[in-house]
């Protein structure tokens, strides 16, 4: 039963890990969110000129977590005419498949763009950059244009103000929580958990429990976590010095990283052990044996030494974490993440010190399941890294192989008498194996989405703005919108205003999957239906976005018969049919 609970925990952790092992800056602690939880465009995408001379300009974009830029939407020009641009060679991006727009390339995290130019006189000039991006949660920003004034090869300070506001703005609470949970889970491995009573015997002198035990355990755990934090900060600085995060787009970095994660996974499966060299480990063992227990100083000393004596069960995921942090290039963030990891690893010891061994689970064979679960998770990270290098169908094939291997390991095809717990594990294995078969079939058919391996049946779209004939009125100028709103106000009819653009993926989803839903369709006739097309994204249309405090499409606004907006009902980003139907129902009660 404990193995089953461990595997269920793995299933919960996998999607979290898929989102949290992105080497891209987060923004969940930063400001600038609108009512829908989206960042302003200048906070979602932060461009800066890092270096410039007479022949080149290095332009860097720092994208917040969950936001990406389209490779094909970049445009560059320089002013005045005496300075000219060369042929810009954009780096390869991550393959991004959309049901409507097909295969594109996008940039996550940090991307460096090398822009060649001809400026032999080194005269001042202005670099004009146009770009466009979206949020994973379903918001597309209009094309944005930034101007950088460069004085004879050096960017002015105003042009470089997008370099980031501090570590906390780029590290979300989720990553810290994930590292804490990872550390907590690492404790329940075959090598670490049995050591807890031994360690507590040295630190607590065999007297766990009470306030004294809590203080001594805390004195042991905090220095251990601080050592992990120092290690994480150093790895972050090392990664920053090599600019690994920007280089992470390159197959020459991604493939070795994926190989390292796969190697660590094999170590977690018990095929070999990763340990410190003997000439380092043995002196540390002697120091730990000489440390005095029963005192705060002795507990702190043991905590520091314990952080250096990495056991075989912890070294593989710890090394994987260090690789990840070195790629992030964030010293502060790396320190915080490994501090959280250390706190997670030390939490069971604090629990033991405060309440005694009765509060901790007993060691046993179930802990091998934790170790194997970490191996599967590390393999999943390796596949995730390879997704940036290989084609979509190949990546889907790899996900299928991982799921199939996990299913077979759980005994999916072992039809022999089993206990109830093992039958549940076999059922879980059959689910993994079923997904694996679906992934392989989808890959052979050219699919690439691991969430929908067999693809989704979607209707074709027309080139122009979508509309339901005879119902939706399409608008493109502020004057047209004002006139339509005034007409609806005079008629005493509520208005449903849909913001749309051809380049907005989520707009297509809403048009084809939400507005066509029968529960939504049944309530639409009560409204004057307006659709504002912001595809052109001219200054007048962008001014209209500012007027309504919007960042871009999709968005749906509700207006009362008297012309006032029901702001609590507005939709920003994607929404499903049930959510929109509920808003329509609430609006109907106000008429």
UniProtKB/Swiss-Prot annotation:
Gene name, Swiss-Prot/TrEMBL: dsbD1
Intrachain disulfide bonds: 134-140, 191-313, 504-507
Protein family: Belongs to the thioredoxin family. DsbD subfamily.
Transmembrane segments: 176-196, 214-234, 252-272, 296-316, 339-359, 366-386, 393-413, 424-444
Subcellular location: Cell inner membrane
Alphabetical list of Gene3D superfamilies matching this protein: Glutaredoxin, Thiol:disulfide interchange protein DsbD, N-terminal domain
Protein name: Thiol:disulfide interchange protein DsbD 1
HAMAP family given in the database record: DbsD
EC code: 1.8.1.8
Top EC category: oxidoreductase
MF terms in GO: electron transfer activity; protein-disulfide reductase [NAD(P)H] activity; protein-disulfide reductase activity
Periplasmic compartment spans: 19-175, 235-251, 317-338, 387-392, 445-591
């Amino acid at each position: 039963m404990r193995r089953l609970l461990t595997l269920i925990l793995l299933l919960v952790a996998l999607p979290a890990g898929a989102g949290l092992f992105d080497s891209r800056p987060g923004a969940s602690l930063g400001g600038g969110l609108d009512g829908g939880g989206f960042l302003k465009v200048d906070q979602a995408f932060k461009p800066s000129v890092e270096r410039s001379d007479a022949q080149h300009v290095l332009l860097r974009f720092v994208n917040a977590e969950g936001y990406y830029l389209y490779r094909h939407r970049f445009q560059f020009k320089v002013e005045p005419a005496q300075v000219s641009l060369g042929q810009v060679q954009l780096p390869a991006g991550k393959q991004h498949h959309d049901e409507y727009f097909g295969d594109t390339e996008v940039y996550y995290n940090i991307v460096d763009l090398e822009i060649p130019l001809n400026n032999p006189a080194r005269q001042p000039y202005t670099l004009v950059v146009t770009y466009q991006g979206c949020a994973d949660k379903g918001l597309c920003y209009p094309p944005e244009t930034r101007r950088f004034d460069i004085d004879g090869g050096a960017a002015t300070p105003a042009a470089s103000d997008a370099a980031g506001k501090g570590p906390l703005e780029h590290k979300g609470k989720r990553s810290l929580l994930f590292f804490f949970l990872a550390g907590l889970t690492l404790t329940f491995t075959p090598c670490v958990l049995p050591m807890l009573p031994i360690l507590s015997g040295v630190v607590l002198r065999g007297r766990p429990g009470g306030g004294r035990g809590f203080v001594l355990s805390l004195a042991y755990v905090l220095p251990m976590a601080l050592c992990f934090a120092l290690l994480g900060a150093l790895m972050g600085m090392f990664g920053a010095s090599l600019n690994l995060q920007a280089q992470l787009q390159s197959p020459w970095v991604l493939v070795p990283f994926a190989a390292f994660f796969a190697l660590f996974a094999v170590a977690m499966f018990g095929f070999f052990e990763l340990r410190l060299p003997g000439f380092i480990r043995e002196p540390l063992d002697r120091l730990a044996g000489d440390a005095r227990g029963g005192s705060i100083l002795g507990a702190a000393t043991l905590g520091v030494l314990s952080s250096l004596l990495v056991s075989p069960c912890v070294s593989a995921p710890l090394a994987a974490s260090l690789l990840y942090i070195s790629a992030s290039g964030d010293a502060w963030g790396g320190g915080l993440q490994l501090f959280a990891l250390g706190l997670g690893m030390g939490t069971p010891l604090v629990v033991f010190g405060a309440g005694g061994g009765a509060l901790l689970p007993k060691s046993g064979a179930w802990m091998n399941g934790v170790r194997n679960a970490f191996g599967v998770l590390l393999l999943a990270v390796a596949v995730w890294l390879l997704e940036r290098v290989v084609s979509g169908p190949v990546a889907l094939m790899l996900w299928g192989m991982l799921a199939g291997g996990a299913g077979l390991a759980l005994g999916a095809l072992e039809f022999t008498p089993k206990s109830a717990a093992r039958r549940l594990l076999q059922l879980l294995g059959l689910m993994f194996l079923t997904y694996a078969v679906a992934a392989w079939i989808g890959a052979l058919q050219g699919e690439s989405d691991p969430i929908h391996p067999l693809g989704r049946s979607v209707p074709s779209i027309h080139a122009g703005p979508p509309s339901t004939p005879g119902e939706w009125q399409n608008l493109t100028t502020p004057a047209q919108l004002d006139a339509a709103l005034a007409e609806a106000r005079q008629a005493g009819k509520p208005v449903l205003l849909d913001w749309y653009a051809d380049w907005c993926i989520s707009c297509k989803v809403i048009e084809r999957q939400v507005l066509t839903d029968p529960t939504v369709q049944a309530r639409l006739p009560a409204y004057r239906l307006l659709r504002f097309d912001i595809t052109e994204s001219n200054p007048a249309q962008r001014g209209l976005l500012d007027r309504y405090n919007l960042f871009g499409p999709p968005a749906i606004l509700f207006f009362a018969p008297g012309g006032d907006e029901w702001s609590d009902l507005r939709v920003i980003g994607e929404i499903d049919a049930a959510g929109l139907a509920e808003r329509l129902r609430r609006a109907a009660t106000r008429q």
